[in-house]
Amino acid sequence: MDSNSSNKIVLVTGANQGLGFAVIEVAGVRYPSNTYILCARDIEKGQQAVHQLRDRGVAAIDLVELDVTNDDHIAAAVRHVEAQYGRLDVLVNNAGFVRLGHQDTNLSEMRATYNEYMNVHITSVAVVTHAFTPLLHRSPAPKVINVTSGLGSITNVLSPRRMARVPPYGASKVGMNGLTAHLQVSENERVAAGEAKAPRIRFFISNPGLLKTAFSNYIAWGKEPQAGAESIVQLMGDEEGKFDHAMQWEHEEGEMRVVPW
C-alpha cells in the first residue's frame, strides 16, 4: 500500500485510546487516502478521539459504537459498514484488556475472570471476524490483523526474560494466536477447494510490545503507543506479500521480526 493505492476501508476495534488510537494516528498520516473506522464502546470517548485525530491531520475517520462482546453492536457495525462502504479491506482486532495485580479471592471469581479474558480475546475475535467476513470477501486484498502480546508466545513465556505474569491474559492471547492460525488454514482450504471466487483473506498476528498506555497503567519502561502501532501499520500496508500471513510479527530496532510461537 503506498500513497498512490486506492482507498482502503480499515476498521480498528478498541480505538478510542492507547494502541488502537495510535494505529489510526500513524496509519492515517502515512496512508491518508484510506478511510479509518474508529470503534469504541463509549461513543462520547470515541467522539473525543475523532476530534483529536483530526487535529493531528487524520481526516477520513468514521465512528462506530462497538462493544466486541455485544452481538447487537457487532451486527449494527456490519450493517453500517455495508451501507456506507460496501466492503471492508482491513480488520484490526485490537480491543482487549488486562488487570495487572488483580487477585481472585474464590473459585467463582477465578472462573469469571478466565471467562471474561477468553470471551474478549478469543470468542469475540472469532465472532467479529466471522461477522465481517462477507464484507472482507468483497475486498480485492482483504486482511485481518489480530493484536497479541508477548505473553501469547509460549516460547517467550518459558524463557527467563523479564515479563509480567498474568496467566488468564496470557492464556487468552495464546488461544487467540491459535485461533488466527486455524482461521487462515480454513480460508486457505476454502480457496483451494474452489468453493467461492472471493479473494483469500490474509490473517496476521501483531505483537506491539509492552506499551506506556492506560492498558498497562502507563508502565515506566513501556514503549510509546505510536512505536507499538508500527508492526500493525506495516502489516496493513503490505501489498507485496513480504510478510508471511498467520505468523506473529513485531517491530523492534527498526525492523519487522517474526515472534516465535
Swiss-Prot record:
<feature type="active site" description="Proton donor">
    <location>
        <position position="169"/>
    </location>
</feature>
<feature type="binding site">
    <location>
        <position position="169"/>
    </location>
    <ligand>
        <name>NADP(+)</name>
    </ligand>
</feature>
<protein>
    <recommendedName>
        <fullName>Short-chain dehydrogenase/reductase AFUA_1G00990</fullName>
        <ecNumber>1.-.-.-</ecNumber>
    </recommendedName>
</protein>
<keyword id="KW-0560">Oxidoreductase</keyword>
<comment type="similarity">
    <text>Belongs to the short-chain dehydrogenases/reductases (SDR) family.</text>
</comment>
<dbReference type="InterPro" id="IPR045313">
    <property type="entry name" value="CBR1-like"/>
</dbReference>
<feature type="binding site">
    <location>
        <position position="213"/>
    </location>
    <ligand>
        <name>NADP(+)</name>
    </ligand>
</feature>
<dbReference type="InterPro" id="IPR036291">
    <property type="entry name" value="NAD(P)-bd_dom_sf"/>
</dbReference>
<feature type="binding site">
    <location>
        <position position="67"/>
    </location>
    <ligand>
        <name>NADP(+)</name>
    </ligand>
</feature>
<feature type="active site" description="Lowers pKa of active site Tyr">
    <location>
        <position position="173"/>
    </location>
</feature>
<dbReference type="InterPro" id="IPR002347">
    <property type="entry name" value="SDR_fam"/>
</dbReference>
<dbReference type="GO" id="GO:0016616">
    <property type="term" value="F:oxidoreductase activity, acting on the CH-OH group of donors, NAD or NADP as acceptor"/>
</dbReference>
<dbReference type="InterPro" id="IPR020904">
    <property type="entry name" value="Sc_DH/Rdtase_CS"/>
</dbReference>
<dbReference type="Pfam" id="PF00106">
    <property type="entry name" value="adh_short"/>
</dbReference>
<feature type="binding site">
    <location>
        <position position="173"/>
    </location>
    <ligand>
        <name>NADP(+)</name>
    </ligand>
</feature>
<feature type="binding site">
    <location>
        <position position="94"/>
    </location>
    <ligand>
        <name>NADP(+)</name>
    </ligand>
</feature>
<keyword id="KW-0521">NADP</keyword>
<dbReference type="GO" id="GO:0044550">
    <property type="term" value="P:secondary metabolite biosynthetic process"/>
</dbReference>
<comment type="function">
    <text>Short-chain dehydrogenase/reductase; part of the gene cluster that mediates the biosynthesis of fumigermin that inhibits germination of spores of the inducing S.rapamycinicus, and thus helps the fungus to defend resources in the shared habitat against a bacterial competitor. The partially reducing polyketide synthase fngA alone is sufficient for the production of fumigermin. FgnA catalyzes the condensation of 3 malonyl-CoA units to an acetyl-CoA starter, and 3 methylations to yield fumigermin.</text>
</comment>
<feature type="binding site">
    <location>
        <position position="19"/>
    </location>
    <ligand>
        <name>NADP(+)</name>
    </ligand>
</feature>
